[in-house]
């Protein structure tokens, strides 16, 4: 074909312009436009966890000293600096700062550059926690740009996508200067806010990169017809180390016509991109097999003890799918298979006719994808003890003793030997980290663990069993974790643990029917817990796969390095069961007082008659839970950021959100933020609006408020005198000072 002179000139000029830049395009006449954006959870300008005060809100793309807005256009001709002091790389969603361009679905690409890691991990003395990262990224959709300036009381919700990352990640959470390269891919996302059953894979392919010695290296991300390639090479070298993942159409699920590729940083990282180039070519994408979410495998949990002091023995088990269970004793069937429902306790009573008996359980699921038989075997030994229903235990106890006060058992033997309705008496002393295995005895009453003296201290305790009462013990160094159900925890003190003090959670492989449910934590205290990352060490937590009916009542959480009470919920798990917190206090924790959810999952938690004082972030927070929360008769005093923050749902109107009654917000000194509450409110609530910016009349009557003294403790850890916070707040409630109802305009009174 012949071209007119003007056409030839145009082609020549365009070619020169393209050759003069670092971008080459085989399928497009016009070079893509590059832009900067920050989006997703924890990218808002108020996010401050492990962030230096002067860096709060920094999630910026900078070129030649200019910070890009979402409307600015750029290219790859100059170095690009990306700094993120918020966001996270989560299993089902991301919060990050992204320098990107949009490409059509019918092209492949190769993106590569030199990357200099200016800083990685928190700039404070905290350690990395594997939610920070930086590198190259391709994803099928963008999140909504974060609000700038931020509307008070609003924070960014999760932004989910299918994606592939060539990611710089912490090597081991111990060092800020040693990182590794990972290929991270996510598939199965069908909604922009995330969904259950999405899948993430993380594959390390270059380990132990020392940033002090080699802060600059080369990275590459490539889309081919059948997948993606991530690669790393030393600076100035073509000695690439690479990793491949199948599925080139992974990034065209939510948007069939386009995808987005570029450079990112998340949580706590700063990188500079230089010598960047993007090359595209026509794609002949090979269709992938439809994504199929991995289902929970059938699980048979033996809930019977390995020791028995009686000839009568209950064979017990739990399963996570409906089915049948058949029991064999010493090779002989004890009857035809019995039906069992997922989550229910299976029990069959037999007699032990010899000193040692062998059992086999055969479980055949009647639902789910895998209906093949599952077998498990165990043995039971008969033993003789002084009084099986009252077993004494000592740190120096021995398995061969009779369990009397003068001949105490060791803790492991006593746990296995204790029958339903019995009590395990703990002598004073320090007990090493202990596991109470799965058990389900209930017909003869609950089992009890309690001290006979004044100070029984466990250096970690894992309660996998159900129907236990745990009273009056102390936990330190390692957490008290509860994975069983129908347990009662009373008058327990947890302190100086390296993670959350007292936590109800479930393993990720058991399935919803076996999630921890109907546990009661009563009149307990948790304080001074601290994880090495300076995060994640809550006082109390009921989070990460919990069922219905868990209750915290009369708890005191203070001076923990994260939240006082944490009900966090991951998208990939689906909504947790509703939790009730009542008559509890959260004081001086480094994050929130009461964190009532997470990641946009709607759950109708309840918090009643509780107090949040001096927490370093928010007093009462929905933490992105848009569900029908019930928040009543609570007091928030002098929390650093918001006393109350309950955000507008991005999914539906206020009428489906929380119910708020008789809540009171107080400050002894002016705060920075108004309370921000969206939901169903009435005139019984008193929330703060800063007077200088308010046109609403404030009550004229005033009364001076004096903070009470801190609780004092003896060397034994017990309170010398009762705390007077509750009395203080009750008095303050009678003299509501500089308070009034505050609501979003769309929320009715």
Curated annotation (Swiss-Prot):
Protein species of origin: Dickeya chrysanthemi
Keywords from the named record: Calcium, Lyase, Metal-binding, Secreted, Signal
Encoding gene (name): pelX
Cofactor: Ca(2+)
E.C. no: 4.2.2.9
Family statement: Belongs to the polysaccharide lyase 9 family.
Catalytic activity of the protein: [(1->4)-alpha-D-galacturonosyl](n) = 4-(4-deoxy-alpha-D-galact-4-enuronosyl)-D-galacturonate + [(1->4)-alpha-D-galacturonosyl](n-2)
Subcellular localization(s) per the UniProt record: Secreted
Stated name of the protein: Pectate disaccharide-lyase
């Amino acid at each position: 074909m012949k071209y007119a002179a003007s056409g030839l000139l145009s082609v020549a000029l365009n070619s020169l312009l393209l050759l003069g830049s670092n971008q080459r395009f085989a399928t497009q006449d016009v070079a893509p436009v590059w832009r900067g954006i920050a989006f997703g959870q924890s990218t808002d300008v108020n996010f401050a966890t492990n962030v230096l005060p002067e860096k709060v809100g920094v999630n910026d793309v900078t070129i030649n000293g200019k910070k890009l807005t979402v409307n600015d256009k750029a290219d790859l001709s100059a170095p690009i600096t990306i700094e993120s002091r918020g966001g996270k790389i989560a299993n089902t969603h991301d919060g990050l700062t992204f320098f990107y361009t949009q490409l059509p679905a019918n092209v492949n690409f190769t993106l590569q550059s030199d990357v200099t890691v200016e800083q990685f991990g928190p700039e404070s003395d905290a350690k990395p926690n594997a939610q920070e990262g930086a590198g190259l990224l391709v994803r099928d959709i963008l999140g909504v740009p974060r609000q700038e300036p931020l509307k008070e009381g609003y924070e960014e919700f999760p932004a989910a996508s299918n994606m592939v990352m060539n990611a710089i990640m912490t090597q081991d959470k111990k060092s800020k200067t040693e990182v590794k390269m990972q290929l991270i891919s996510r598939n199965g996302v069908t909604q922009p806010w995330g969904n259950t059953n999405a899948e993430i894979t993380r594959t390390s392919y270059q380990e132990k990169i020392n940033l002090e010695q080699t802060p600059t290296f080369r990275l590459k991300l490539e889309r081919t017809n059948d997948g993606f390639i991530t690669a790393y090479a030393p600076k100035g070298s073509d000695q690439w180390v690479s990793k491949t993942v199948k599925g080139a159409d992974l990034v065209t699920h939510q948007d069939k016509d386009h995808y987005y590729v570029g450079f990112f940083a998340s949580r706590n990282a700063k990188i500079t991109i230089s010598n960047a180039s993007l090359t595209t070519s026509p794609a002949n994408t090979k269709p992938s097999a439809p994504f199929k979410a991995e289902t929970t495998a059938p699980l048979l949990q033996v809930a019977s003890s390995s020791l028995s002091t009686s000839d009568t023995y209950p064979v017990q088990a739990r399963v996570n799918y409906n089915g049948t269970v058949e029991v064999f004793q010493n090779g002989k069937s004890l009857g035809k298979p019995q039906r069992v429902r997922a989550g229910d306790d299976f029990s069959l009573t037999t007699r032990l006719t010899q000193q040692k008996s062998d059992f086999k359980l055969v479980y055949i699921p009647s639902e789910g994808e895998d209906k093949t038989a599952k077998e498990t075997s165990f043995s039971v030994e008969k033993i003789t003890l002084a009084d099986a229903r009252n077993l004494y235990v000592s740190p120096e106890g021995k398995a061969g003793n009779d369990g009397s006060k003068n001949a105490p058992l060791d803790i492991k033997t006593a746990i296995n030997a204790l029958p339903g309705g019995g009590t395990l008496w703990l002598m004073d002393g320090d007990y090493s980290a202990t596991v109470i295995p799965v058990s389900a005895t209930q017909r003869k009453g609950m089992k009890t663990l309690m001290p006979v003296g004044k100070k029984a201290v466990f250096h970690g305790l894992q309660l996998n069993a159900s129907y236990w009462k745990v009273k009056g013990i102390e936990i330190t160094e390692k957490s008290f974790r509860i994975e069983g159900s129908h347990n009662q925890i009373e008058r327990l003190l947890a302190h100086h643990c390296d993670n959350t003090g007292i936590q109800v959670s479930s393993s990720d492989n058991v399935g919803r029917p076996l999630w921890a449910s109907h546990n009661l934590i009563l009149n307990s205290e948790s304080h001074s817990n601290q994880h090495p990352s300076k995060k994640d060490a809550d006082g109390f937590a009921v989070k990460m796969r919990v069922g219905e009916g868990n209750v915290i009542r009369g708890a005191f959480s203070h001076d923990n390095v994260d939240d006082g009470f944490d009900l966090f919920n991951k998208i990939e798990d689906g909504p947790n069961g509703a939790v009730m917190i009542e008559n509890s206090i959260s004081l001086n924790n480094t994050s929130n007082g009461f964190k009532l959810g997470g990641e946009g999952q709607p759950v109708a938690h309840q918090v009643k008659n509780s107090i949040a004082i001096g927490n370093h972030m928010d007093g009462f927070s929905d933490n992105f839970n848009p569900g029908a929360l019930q928040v009543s008769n609570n007091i928030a005093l002098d929390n650093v950021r918001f006393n109350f923050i309950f955000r507008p749902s991005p999914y539906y109107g206020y009428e489906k959100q929380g119910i708020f009654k008789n809540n009171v917000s107080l400050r002894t000194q002016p705060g920075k933020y108004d309370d921000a509450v969206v939901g169903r409110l009435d005139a019984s609530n008193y929330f703060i609006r800063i007077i200088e910016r308010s046109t609403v009349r404030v009550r004229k009557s005033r009364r001076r408020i004096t903070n009470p003294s801190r609780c004092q403790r003896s060397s034994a850890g017990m309170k010398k005198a009762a705390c007077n916070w509750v009395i203080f707040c009750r008095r303050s409630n009678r003299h509501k000072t500089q308070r009034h109802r505050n609501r979003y305009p769309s929320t009715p009174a």
